[in-house]
């Protein structure tokens, strides 16, 4: 999400925050970070989480418009700059991973975005970039912590669920929101984030109790998006609806925001089929690509993977993008969005929406671009 003074910060009394600059729809001049590719993206689940009949095969694609602001202590302790400290302080073996409450923070940071992927849950969070202008603003920390605590809450709930009991993703997100508030407020770390997540579950057949089918619980706050594509019909069977306060100011969770999961999050339940592809995307994707462009790119990536166009050597069935194809799907979609984002003359959905609001805008929208692609498969584990 771009640095936008039109975020919820603009609604905060000036007695709490410094004066905000006037919003201008001018092209940002951030130097793009190197695109990052990850071979393994599925996080390890807790040992006591039950095995479900279905699972996700996942892949991610990330592009950051600028380097993320480093997490502050105690979440990340940077090495001292004093030459009087022991040399071990600066040694490469020193642990620079991010922690909260003694645990490694799950997921990956991408500029102000954060993503998470596991066998049963994926999410994409978009931190509000305007916090980068505040000395204690850490939107990237907020987006990462919400994903971390949300995934933990979902796994804890899943471990305690009775058979056939439905999950409650809004309650899990509310718990994550409250834990993030507690963790950041005590250290004066400010920020807000939008979020979307998709939790995979299942249901029993009405007539044949031995028959199970996959079900997806999708939860959204703001303008990230979950989209479900059925390659067998080449159709989008579901996508979330963006939530706005006003143009370019989505609903968001965090410092000084009136939005909360219990009050503003929307959850939908979708019947899935094995082979369906679930996407969790930041607005860096949907602001630069129309729906039909996303669908076309996904279908092409899957077809290329099935035909062996990609050079990666993967054993096993490649049908529908299995055994590594989701990594290619996510990276290809990220690359398609990036090409538009950096093109000052491209036509984009964001440009179209801005013009509808009477605002001057041209080209793509340079933003952090985060994609999590997940393929629904039977769980043979």
Regions found by a protein language model. Give the residues of each.
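PP2C/PPM-type serine/threonine phosphatase catalytic domain
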Residues: 2-381
């Amino acid at each position: 999400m771009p640095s936008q003074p039109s975020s919820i910060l603009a609604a905060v009394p000036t007695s709490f925050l410094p004066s905000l600059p006037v919003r201008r729809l001018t092209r940002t001049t951030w130097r793009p970070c190197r695109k990052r590719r990850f071979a393994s993206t599925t996080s390890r689940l807790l040992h006591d989480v039950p095995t479900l009949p279905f699972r996700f095969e996942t892949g991610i694609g990330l592009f950051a418009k600028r380097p993320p602001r480093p997490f502050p202590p105690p979440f990340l302790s940077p090495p001292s700059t004093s030459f009087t400290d022991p040399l071990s302080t600066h040694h490469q073996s020193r642990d620079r991973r991010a922690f909260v409450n003694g645990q490694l923070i799950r997921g990956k940071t991408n500029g102000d975005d954060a993503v998470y992927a596991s066998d049963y849950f994926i999410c994409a969070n978009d931190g509000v970039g305007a916090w980068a202008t505040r000395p204690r603003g850490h939107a990237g920390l907020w987006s990462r912590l919400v994903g971390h605590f949300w995934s933990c809450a979902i796994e804890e709930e899943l471990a305690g669920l009775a058979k056939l009991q439905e999950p409650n993703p809004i309650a899990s997100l509310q718990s994550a929101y409250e834990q993030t508030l507690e963790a950041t407020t005590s250290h004066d770390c400010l920020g807000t984030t939008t979020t979307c997540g998709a939790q995979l579950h299942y249901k029993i057949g009405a007539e044949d109790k031995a028959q199970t089918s996959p079900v997806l619980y999708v939860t959204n706050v703001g303008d990230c998006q979950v989209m479900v594509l059925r390659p067998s019909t080449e159709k989008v069977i579901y996508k979330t609806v963006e939530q706005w306060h006003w143009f370019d100011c989505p609903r968001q969770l965090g410092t000084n925001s009136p939005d909360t999961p219990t009050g503003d999050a929307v959850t939908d339940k979708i019947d899935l089929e094995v082979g369906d592809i679930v996407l969790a995307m930041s607005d860096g994707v949907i602001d630069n690509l129309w729906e039909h462009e996303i669908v076309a790119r996904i279908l092409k990536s899957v077809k290329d993977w099935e035909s062996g166009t990609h050079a990666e050597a993967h054993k096993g069935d490649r049908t529908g993008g299995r055994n590594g194809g989701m990594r290619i799907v996510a990276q290809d979609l990220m690359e398609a969005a990036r090409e538009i984002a950096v093109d000052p003359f491209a036509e984009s959905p964001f440009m179209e929406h801005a013009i509808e609001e009477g605002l001057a805008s041209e080209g793509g929208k340079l933003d952090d671009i985060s994609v999590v692609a997940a393929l629904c498969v039977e769980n043979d584990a």
